[in-house]
C-alpha cells in the first residue's frame, strides 16, 4: 500500500508542471498591444518570450519584440513608454529609477548566463593585460562588472573595445580582432561547436551570478493595465512550464530565431539553460538577482546612493498570475 501511494505521488509531481502549463487563462479586457524590449538581438534566453508572443498573437493579442543595440536604450525606451515591458539585466533599470523613472521588477527570466572566453594562449585573467577585450556596452551590467573585476581583482588594464551583440564578439574573436570577451552561454556553446579546442572559458568565480535577466514594466502602463500585465505574465509562466515539462517544444523556436546555432547543439543548449543557468523559473523565481546585483555594485562603489530593492519590485502582478495558474510544487 505504501509503495502504491508513493507511486501515485510520483506520478502527481511529474504531471504537475504539464497540467499547470495547460491551465486556460481568460483573455483580459483592455488594450492587448504589448511591445517587449530586448537589450540585443534575440538570444536563447529570449526564446520562451518569443514562443509566448507567437501563441498570444494567434489568440488576438498584438505582442511585438523590439531589439535594441544597447542595454541602456532598451531601458530608456521602457522609461519613456515607447515599450511597455523589457527583458533586462539589473543595472540599467536601477540607474533609470535613480534618475526618476517609474519602472518595476516583475519576475525573473534567468540566472547568471555569461562566461568570459579567450584564445587558448591566454591562460587566466592576468594574461589579458594590454590585450583587446570586447564588451557589449559601457552601461551593460555584465560589461561594467567585468571591467571592475579585471581592474580590482586581476589588477590589469586591458584594451577595452565595445562590440554590441554576442554573435558579433564571437566573429571578432574568430577573426583575431580581439583576444578575449564575455558572451552568453548559448554563444559559447555555439562557438565551441564550430571551433572545438581553439578557445576556452576563463574562470571568474561567482562574478557572473549577477548577470541574470528579469522582466521590468513601465509603471504608468502597469497602473492602467494591471490585468493585461497579470495575464501576460501568467502566459509567460505557462511557456516556462511547457519548456520544463518537455524541452523539445522550444527547439523549433530556437532553430527559427537563432539560425546560426548548429542544429545538433540546440537540445544540449536548452538543457544547459534549464540546469546550469536555472532559466525560466516555473513560479517566477525570486528577487535574489536584483538584491545581489545592487549589493555588488554598492560594495564596489559604482552605486553612490543607497538602493532599497524592495521599492523596485511590484509583487502583485506575479502573485496574481500564480493565483490564476497555481504553483508548481518544489519549483522556483
Regions found by a protein language model. Name each.
Residues 1-33, 326-332:
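Short, low-complexity disordered leader/linker segments with a strong preference
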Residues 21-165, 172, 179-185, 201-209:
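Short, glycine-/small- and polar/acidic-enriched structural segments
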Residues 225-304:
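Secondary-structure end/capping motifs
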Residues 295-332:
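Conserved C-terminal helix/tail region of periplasmic/extracytoplasmic solute-binding proteins
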Residues 101-103, 196-199, 320-322:
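Short low-complexity, flexible loop/linker segments enriched in glycine and/or proline
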Residues 121-123, 223, 282:
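Proline/Glycine/Serine-rich low-complexity intrinsically disordered segments
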Residues 91, 167-260:
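Pocket-lining segment of extracytoplasmic ligand-binding domains
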Amino acid at each position: 500500500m505504501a509503495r502504491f501511494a508513493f507511486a501515485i505521488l510520483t506520478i502527481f509531481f511529474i504531471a504537475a508542471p504539464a497540467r499547470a502549463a495547460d491551465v486556460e487563462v481568460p483573455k483580459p479586457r483592455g488594450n492587448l498591444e504589448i511591445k517587449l524590449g530586448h537589450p540585443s538581438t534575440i538570444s536563447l534566453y529570449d526564446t520562451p518570450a518569443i514562443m509566448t508572443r507567437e501563441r498570444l498573437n494567434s489568440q488576438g493579442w498584438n505582442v511585438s519584440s523590439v531589439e535594441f543595440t544597447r542595454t541602456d536604450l532598451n531601458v530608456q525606451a521602457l522609461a519613456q513608454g515607447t515599450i511597455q515591458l523589457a527583458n533586462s539585466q539589473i543595472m540599467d533599470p536601477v540607474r533609470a529609477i535613480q534618475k526618476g523613472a517609474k519602472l518595476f521588477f516583475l519576475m525573473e527570466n534567468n540566472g547568471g548566463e555569461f562566461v568570459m572566453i579567450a584564445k587558448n594562449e591566454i591562460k587566466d585573467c592576468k594574461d589579458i593585460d594590454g590585450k583587446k577585450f570586447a564588451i557589449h556596452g559601457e552601461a551593460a551590467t555584465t560589461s561594467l562588472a567585468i571591467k571592475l573585476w579585471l581592474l580590482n581583482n586581476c589588477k590589469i588594464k586591458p584594451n577595452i573595445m565595445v562590440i554590441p551583440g554576442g554573435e558579433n564578439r564571437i566573429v571578432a574573436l574568430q577573426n583575431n580582432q580581439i583576444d578575449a570577451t564575455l558572451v552568453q552561454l548559448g554563444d559559447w556553446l555555439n562557438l565551441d561547436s564550430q571551433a572545438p579546442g581553439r578557445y576556452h572559458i576563463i574562470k571568474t568565480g561567482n562574478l557572473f551570478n549577477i548577470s541574470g535577466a528579469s522582466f521590468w514594466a513601465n509603471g504608468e502602463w502597469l497602473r492602467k493595465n494591471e490585468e493585461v500585465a497579470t495575464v501576460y505574465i501568467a502566459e509567460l509562466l505557462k511557456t516556462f512550464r511547457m519548456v520544463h515539462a518537455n524541452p523539445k517544444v522550444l527547439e523549433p523556436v530556437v532553430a527559427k530565431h537563432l539560425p546560426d546555432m548548429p542544429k545538433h547543439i540546440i537540445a544540449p543548449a536548452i538543457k544547459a539553460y534549464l540546469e546550469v543557468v536555472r532559466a525560466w523559473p516555473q513560479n517566477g523565481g525570486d528577487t535574489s538577482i536584483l538584491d545581489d546585483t545592487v549589493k555588488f555594485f554598492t560594495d564596489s562603489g559604482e552605486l553612490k546612493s543607497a538602493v532599497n530593492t524592495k521599492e523596485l519590485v511590484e509583487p502583485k502582478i506575479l502573485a496574481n498570475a500564480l493565483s490564476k495558474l497555481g504553483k508548481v510544487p518544489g519549483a522556483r
